[in-house]
């Protein structure tokens, strides 16, 4: 989730955040804590959940704006004789009201409700670290993210999610210097799909432990042919006039009960497959974006809850990576591991291909400008740099998912950065960038 709080509303902007809160973060509160999991809360998400006035606006959206859009579409469907679709939309609307009730019951403190589950952290604004131009730029992202976690959640074990699972061997020493002791990597191209090597941790010469994610199990959930593509599940891409979803993937009216039953079947299948995967030992790391569960895949939270139940029923032990490290001796990592991500093709092309070369160049130019300024760089310029380094802008542009919004956002932050570095004393750039990176760490040598 990039920093969208205060940067537009609909169709692109902070409504993305409100939607994720209602459909992913709040529903997951009923599942987190039921079994060991490794949860990384990205600092830039926490910045927004902590932003003054953010939860009040989210509640207004849930209580006023969303219900009105539901009402309009329900009336439209009924007028068209689509009573079954209208009934489904009314049922779905009640879930948003329930999310608002939960938020109000916790006093709007969603971050506080998530806090007990936050064990790992990540880079400050989810930058693709191998694409950063300088060691100082990497340290800025990593150390600011760690500082954010420590202030908000206290204890930190040294676990760190690499944004986009993007890893390059040259990062390992920098990560260790910042205090990172464990992270996840995508090594399918190095070991082969389904290889046993994905089930054991690796240790680098520089120090950090690398946990290979298991693409074979992840693909069951997160791929074009994975569980979410089943015909009975709710179609994410087809929607009503006000972007409500009432159809199944197979084109029929969505049947909530049938989809929930299928999610439980898929959970049983998933657990059985993972049990077979680790029958000779090892740790199967199934890493998922939180927003996949509930937002992109509507039934995902039901599936996850059923996975926990099935794991207990089928005898599949669950653990988090911090605990697992105490029971699994890491093997030496090859010094020639490839540069990898969990993006399309397993490489960096999503964020640096010709289609987004202008964005990659803009980010690199901005970083070098801030580094050259060193200690003279105002904090406003550094925060603008962090904002434009978010991996989401190039991802959205590559997939053509948000019109001109990604380029407009990057361009706006680049312009503000240059203005701040110019030293212009016109009051145009006073203060912070909303609540972005309140725990900014700028080394003296930056």
Predicted regions, residues:
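Conserved short loop/turn motifs at secondary-structure junctions
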Residues: 155-167, 289-293, 402
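Active-site and substrate-binding clefts of carbohydrate-active enzymes
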Residues: 1-94, 98, 195-446
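His/Asp/Glu-enriched short active-site or ligand-binding loop at hydrolase and phosphoryl-transfer sites
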Residues: 180-192, 317-322
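Short, solvent-exposed turn/loop segments enriched in Gly/Ser/Thr/Pro and often Arg
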Residues: 40-45, 123, 159-168, 322-325
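Acidic (Asp/Glu)-rich catalytic clusters
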Residues: 31-34, 106-120, 150, 278-279
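Hydrophobic faces of well-ordered beta-strands that scaffold small-molecule active sites
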Residues: 37-39, 119-122, 158, 182-185, ...
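Glycine-rich phosphate-binding "P-loop"
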Residues: 121-144
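CE4/NodB-like, metal-dependent polysaccharide N-deacetylase domain
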Residues: 138-162, 272-287
């Amino acid at each position: 989730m990039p920093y969208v709080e205060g940067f537009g509303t609909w169709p692109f902007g902070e409504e993305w955040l409100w939607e994720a809160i209602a459909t992913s973060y709040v529903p997951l509160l009923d599942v987190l804590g039921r079994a060991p999991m490794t949860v990384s809360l990205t600092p830039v998400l926490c910045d927004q959940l902590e932003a003054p006035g953010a939860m009040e606006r989210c509640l207004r959206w849930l209580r006023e704006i969303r219900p009105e859009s539901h009402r309009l579409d329900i009336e439209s469907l009924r007028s068209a004789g689509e009573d079954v679709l209208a009934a489904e939309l009314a049922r779905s609307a009640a879930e948003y009201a329930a999310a608002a009730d939960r938020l109000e019951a916790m006093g709007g403190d969603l971050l506080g409700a998530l806090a007990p589950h936050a064990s790992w952290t990540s880079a400050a604004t989810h930058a693709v670290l191998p694409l950063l131009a300088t060691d100082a730029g990497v340290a800025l992202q990593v150390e600011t993210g760690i500082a954010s976690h420590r202030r908000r959640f206290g204890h930190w074990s040294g676990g760190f999610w690499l944004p986009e699972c993007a890893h390059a061997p040259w990062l390992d020493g920098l990560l260790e210097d910042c205090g990172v002791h464990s992270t996840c990597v995508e090594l399918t191209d190095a070991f082969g799909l389904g290889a046993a090597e994905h089930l054991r941790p690796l240790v680098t010469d520089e120090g950090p432990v690398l946990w290979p994610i298991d693409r074979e199990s992840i693909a069951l959930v997160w791929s074009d042919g994975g569980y979410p593509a089943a015909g009975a599940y709710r179609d994410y891409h087809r929607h009503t006039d006000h972007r409500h979803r009432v159809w199944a993937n197979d084109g029929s009216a969505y049947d909530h009960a049938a989809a929930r039953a299928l999610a439980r079947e898929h959970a049983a299948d998933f657990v059985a497959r993972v049990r077979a995967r680790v029958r000779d030992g090892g740790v199967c790391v199934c890493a998922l974006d939180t927003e996949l569960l509930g937002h992109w895949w509507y039934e995902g939270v039901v599936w996850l809850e059923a996975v926990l139940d099935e794991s207990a029923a089928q005898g599949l032990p669950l653990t988090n990576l911090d605990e697992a490290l105490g029971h699994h001796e890491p093997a030496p990592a090859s010094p020639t591991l490839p540069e990898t991500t969990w993006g399309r093709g397993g490489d960096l092309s999503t964020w640096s291909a010709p289609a987004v070369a202008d964005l990659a160049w803009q980010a690199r130019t901005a970083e070098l400008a801030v580094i050259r300024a060193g200690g003279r760089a105002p904090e406003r310029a550094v925060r603008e740099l962090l904002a434009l380094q978010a991996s989401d802008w190039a991802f959205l542009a590559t997939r053509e998912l948000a019109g001109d919004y990604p380029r407009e956002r990057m361009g706006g932050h680049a312009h503000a950065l240059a203005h701040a570095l110019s030293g212009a004393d016109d009051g145009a750039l006073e203060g912070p960038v909303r609540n972005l990176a309140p725990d900014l760490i700028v080394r003296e040598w930056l």
